[in-house]
Amino acid sequence: MRVDGAKGRIAGDAAAIALYAIASALLLHPMLAGGIENFCVGAPESNDPQIFIWGLAWYPYAISHGLDPLFTNLVFAPHGYNLAWSTTIPAPALLMWPITARFGPLVSFNLLSLLTPTLSAYTAYGLCRHTTNAALPAIFGGFIYGFSTYQRIEADHLNLALTFIPPLLVMLFLLRLANRIGKLRCELLLFASLTIQFLISPEIFATAIIFGAIAIAAAWWIGDAEFRLRLRTPLRESTVAFALAVVALSPYIYRFIPSPFGLSPIYNPAHCSSDLFGFIFPTNASLAGTLKFARTLGRRIGFGCEPASYMGLLPVIAIWFAFNPRAKSAETFSLERYLALLLAVIVVLALGPVIHLAGVPIAPSIWLPALLFPLLNNALPARFVLYGFLTLSVTIALWLSDARRCVWTRWLVTAAAVVSILPTAVPAAKATLPFFSEHIYRDYLSINETVMILPFADNGAAMKWQAQSGFFFRVAGGYFSVIPHDYNAWPIVPALLDDDPYVPGYADQFKAFLAAHDVSAVIVPETEYARYAKLCATLRTAAQHVGGVVFLRVNPATLAPFDSATAAAMDTRYNLDRFAVLIRATREFLGHGNSLRDLNPFSAERLGLLDASVAGDPTRAQTSGYPFIDTVRRSRAFQSIAEYLISHRMIRERLAIELGPHMVGDATSTSGIWIGPWTTNAIAIGVLAGPEAAATLRARFGPRADAIYYPYPLPYSTSRMSADDPQMMLMIFKVTMLPALDESPRPLN
């Protein structure tokens, strides 16, 4: 359907907006049915929305109170958090300020979630309309982008779901290429778009630049000399706009440096990449994935982190179109083949640094060198499919507008392809508790009082409730990209993160943490209290059931014995306890006639020799799929490089363990222990420990050890001791030495 004139364009735009709005309402109908003021998009599957709800409240609050918007001590109190390393969406927060002020941040979040698919689809529609000059094909193209598998998977991540800028960037470039807008207007619009995109998601800002550069390079390669000459003008002006955006954003960008995470990424990109099968087989994010065969297949295969790559039958059209393009063979530039090439590049990069098939790593991929570049290595390849769906949206619009083909073929094939990717509804659940929504907390708390809300971090919703209170209280905890070092150094924090706080000495560990962070109250939702009742009972205070929560006022006398406790001292106590438990478990494991080669945390747990809180869960290999690591790990040159990175704290402990010369196998766990064979007659026992704890462990057990590593795989040396994140303290003992090791508790001075 081609429509000429202003009236036709307005009619097409109105039809597109109406269709997308209806589709958005259907996609988010669980939230609308429950009530925009009470339900939360993404709940109960995810607690991630609290980050965005908090951000929507924080930026207006910070600006109106004259606070630094990129730093807060209202979470992770009293030390605070650098918000440059968060996903708190400052641009949408400022846009929604009036609504947040009137109705609260939960309503703002839900409205943005409702608007997001429509807005993203509409900007893609505009791009497709520019490319095809046909309304109906453009409407289909916009739908494919705005209601893609990616959009459904990221629906509860507003920083990733607000994807209306990338189509605008492409359209501005094409308008300038066709000389339909002037130089200054193009530069200003590109500058504004890039700046807004950064303030929504620095990750999409970076990847949009990368894939934009790839698209331009591919066009340069395919095009003839005349086209390349035309390409220079928008390329030059885009570069100017990018430079201006970087300058304007430099105060924000400056806050990224130095990275608190070293050279290694926050999350391993190999663990959040697209699986080859993920492009073919649907997940429960698509209606096709709800079919019985798809559910069975999904359980067997598993698609890993953020499985957004399912494209249904859309790539079939792209391939068909590429091999039978509209362009005549004499023409040098085929838009269809260009788009197919671009889609292929995006798919390959979305596979990440390691290609996975049904969750099994099979080979390194071309994204591997990106791991060498800080900031860039934090981009998760599974999210690159965003640009694949944008490419497909334009491809499908072109296909539908190709009058050379049979009209029934075009529309029936496209309809089948669109049906194959139709998303399921985004879940929603009640996200309010009367204690917070009805302001009951004002009767129990003072302004700026520090509270601890359980469950902790991403297991709970502390930041959401703090935002709903208008930042009435501070929170000892929070949930952003990572837990700050000054929190993570307390042993109870990793235990709470694992949602299993009952580690050795948990009562004292909990009270010491509360004392150090000036916590005067603990709040637990009534529905979660059973899991934490034993922990809260250590406070010896009355549990008050009010407004859907259990409120516990902390008695200062209970915490008084821990007033001078430090994280280092509690870490030392904790690891002395753990090391003794591991020695005892090893001794009993071998004493029962088990083979040394079968010793690991999980075999000991199965025999009842280790509690689940000590044993932890199996760790996911950080270097899985990098075959050269296993080949060269024992070489002196490789170990020299690894030692330099580890000694300068450029990589974290889990990767450091795998870069060592010894094959770890099942000996380590998520709880931060190492227990297993070292040689045929020697065992390795280790714990994640800070420098003070490591020194104490060495003094107590070192005289009977054959070797001591800290941080592993480096030999123990006091010259490397520093107040940093816990590292693996590993000791090697001969089996014959086990009976001589003292496992009895020893009080600290």
Where are these regions (language model features)?
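Start-transfer (signal-anchor) and selected internal transmembrane alpha helices
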Residues: 1-31, 236-243, 330-340, 749
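Hydrophobic alpha-helical membrane-interfacial segments at the cytosolic entry of transmembrane helices
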Residues: 13-21, 192-193, 229-253, 266-271, ...
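Hydrophobic/aromatic-rich transmembrane helices and adjacent perimembrane loops
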Residues: 310-313, 362-403
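Membrane-embedded helix bundles of polyisoprenyl
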Residues: 20, 112-131, 135-222, 238-253, ...
